[in-house]
């Protein structure tokens, strides 16, 4: 089975009405995954035996009308803890790590009787924009197997784009849900910071990380995001705000008439011409539906990437200190003393990009450089947040391209970290400000036929307006209905 021609609600109805059983659906899902996994390589591990066992249990007790995800196969990014199922963060350091507890988001999914088909590939410790930094293998873009799927949630995006699953969990620290969504022509939502618990997420940048979904369509995304949202006393940064029923507002009456859309002029700087054409057409379409489109300025956008990489790398250097070769994780062989354990375990266990960011972060936090780098970057973060606040005084959403280009060729940028980092120029400011943002399919490049994503940014905790805008665009276009001819190159 592939999930291109269905939705979560339709699938739920079929399961409730016994048009298909959870066991049949799960078997068909694995058949589909196995049919293209050799090409796409979206999964680090598959969970077939446990998934089929779980499906049989769900069939035995039955599925009620209020259990939306019961019996539904979904995927989980491999930096999200799953009890009894290896969680590697795509790193040699955690290659054999078997968690003893579930992340909060997984607990919620288990309570809703979902079926976990497997753990998806990512850049090691979620550090990267192409999924080429995985310690195990590179995931391929289903639209063109010679191109990257984006990162760090590239495996999750590729699994959804390939029709393996209706939805896959990802994490977004600086664009790691939205950029893969754009590259793969799917929907990817980063909720407001604090909307979803981070408990059980392998930490990269704790003040940036947020969990979200990659899905085939906007309404499924809204339904699944609501399921994992809400306060968690184990995560002191999780919000006490009530979680709205976003999907209930997505219907034939939803419109964008009078919606005030801000388009930052800085978001067109450096855009590839083919991307620019798609984004301008998308804005024209929204305007034709009654939205009011204004050009605005977010003047500190250009400082976002350097500030982000200082701050996020500083947090990463602190978070990754725990991997020392002593308590758990990879430990180097034939070590001579304690210092040897530390040095060799970390040198051999971490990949090049992770070590690069640890070094950058440690330098930024060191005596004599803290004020010049970390402190200054923190000030830039506040200025970026203020830019957004100023624009949102007179506008409902901010809209622009998700990325400056379409998916690039595998190997094209992996040896050029600075170019790779600049891919995040349009996404990292959102994480700096903790705002909700979603990438939706907006069209295809006239140059190479690859998908282009439209990024919709909302006010803090106003996911509803983001979903409304994306839903109206989606329902009045057909870009989300286009699917890759797997194996074909555009």
From Swiss-Prot:
Record's catalysed reaction(s): L-glutamyl-tRNA(Gln) + L-glutamine + ATP + H2O = L-glutaminyl-tRNA(Gln) + L-glutamate + ADP + phosphate + H(+)
Signal peptide: none
EC number: 6.3.5.7
Keyword annotations: ATP-binding, Ligase, Nucleotide-binding, Protein biosynthesis
InterPro entries for this protein: Amidase, Amidase_CS, Amidase_dom, AS_sf, GatA
One annotated Gene Ontology cellular component of this protein: glutamyl-tRNA(Gln) amidotransferase complex
Keyword Disulfide bond: no
Molecular-function GO term, any one: ATP binding
PROSITE patterns given in the database record: AMIDASES (PS00571)
SUPFAM superfamilies: Amidase signature (AS) enzymes
Disulfide bonds: none
The UniProt record lists the keyword Magnesium: no
Active site: 77, 152, 176
GO biological process, one term: translation
Protein task: Allows the formation of correctly charged Gln-tRNA(Gln) through the transamidation of misacylated Glu-tRNA(Gln) in organisms which lack glutaminyl-tRNA synthetase. The reaction takes place in the presence of glutamine and ATP through an activated gamma-phospho-Glu-tRNA(Gln).
Xref: HAMAP family: GatA (MF_00120)
Subunit organization: Heterotrimer of A, B and C subunits.
UniProt record similarity statement: Belongs to the amidase family. GatA subfamily.
Name of this chain's protein: Glutamyl-tRNA(Gln) amidotransferase subunit A
Gene: gatA
């Amino acid at each position: 089975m592939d999930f291109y021609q269905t939705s979560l609600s339709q699938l739920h109805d079929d399961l409730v009405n016994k048009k298909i059983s959870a066991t049949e659906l799960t078997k068909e899902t694995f058949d589909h995954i196995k049919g293209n996994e050799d090409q796409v390589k979206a999964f680090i591990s598959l969970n077939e035996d446990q998934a089929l066992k779980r499906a049989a249990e769900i069939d035995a007790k039955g599925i009620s009308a209020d259990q939306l995800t019961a019996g539904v196969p979904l995927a989980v990014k491999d930096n999200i803890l799953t009890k009894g199922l290896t969680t590697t963060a795509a790193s040699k350091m955690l290659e054999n790590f078997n968690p003893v507890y579930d992340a909060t988001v997984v607990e919620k999914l288990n309570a809703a009787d979902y079926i976990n088909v497997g753990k998806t590939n990512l850049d090691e410790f979620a550090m990267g924009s192409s999924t080429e930094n995985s310690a195990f293998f590179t995931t391929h873009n289903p639209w063109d197997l010679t191109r990257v799927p984006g990162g760090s949630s590239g495996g999750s995006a590729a699994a959804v784009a390939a029709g393996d699953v209706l939805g896959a969990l990802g994490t977004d620290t600086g664009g790691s849900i939205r950029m893969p969504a754009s590259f793969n022509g799917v929907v990817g939502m980063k909720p407001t910071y604090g909307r979803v618990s981070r408990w059980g997420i392998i930490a990269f940048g704790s003040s940036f990380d947020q969990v979200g979904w990659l899905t085939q369509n906007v309404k499924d995304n809204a339904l699944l995001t609501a399921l994992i949202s809400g306060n968690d006393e184990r995560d002191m940064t999780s919000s006490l705000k009530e979680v709205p029923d976003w999907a209930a507002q997505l219907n034939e009456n939803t419109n964008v008439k009078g919606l005030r859309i801000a388009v930052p002029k800085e978001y067109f700087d450096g855009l590839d011409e083919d991307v620019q054409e798609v984004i301008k057409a998308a804005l024209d379409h929204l305007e034709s539906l009654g939205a009011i489109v204004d050009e605005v300025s977010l003047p500190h956008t250009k400082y976002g990437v350097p500030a982000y990489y200082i701050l996020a790398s500083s947090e990463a250097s602190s978070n990754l200190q725990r991997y020392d070769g002593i308590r758990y994780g990879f430990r180097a062989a034939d070590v001579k003393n304690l210092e040897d354990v530390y040095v060799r375990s970390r040198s051999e266990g971490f990949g090049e990009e992770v070590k690069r960011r640890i070094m950058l972060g440690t330098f930024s936090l060191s005596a004599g450089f803290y004020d010049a780098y970390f402190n200054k970057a923190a000030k830039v973060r506040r200025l970026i947040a203020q830019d957004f606040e100023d624009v949102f005084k007179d506008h409902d959403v901010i809209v622009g391209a998700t990325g400056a280009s379409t998916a690039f060729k595998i190997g094209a940028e992996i040896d050029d970290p600075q170019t790779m980092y600049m891919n995040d120029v349009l996404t990292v400011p959102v994480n700096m400000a903790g705002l909700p943002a979603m990438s939706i399919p907006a069209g295809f490049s006239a140059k190479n036929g690859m998908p282009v994503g439209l990024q919709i940014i909302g006010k803090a905790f106003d996911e509803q307006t983001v979903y409304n805008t994306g839903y109206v665009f989606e329902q009045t276009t057909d870009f989300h209905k286009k699917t890759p001819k797997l194996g074909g190159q555009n």
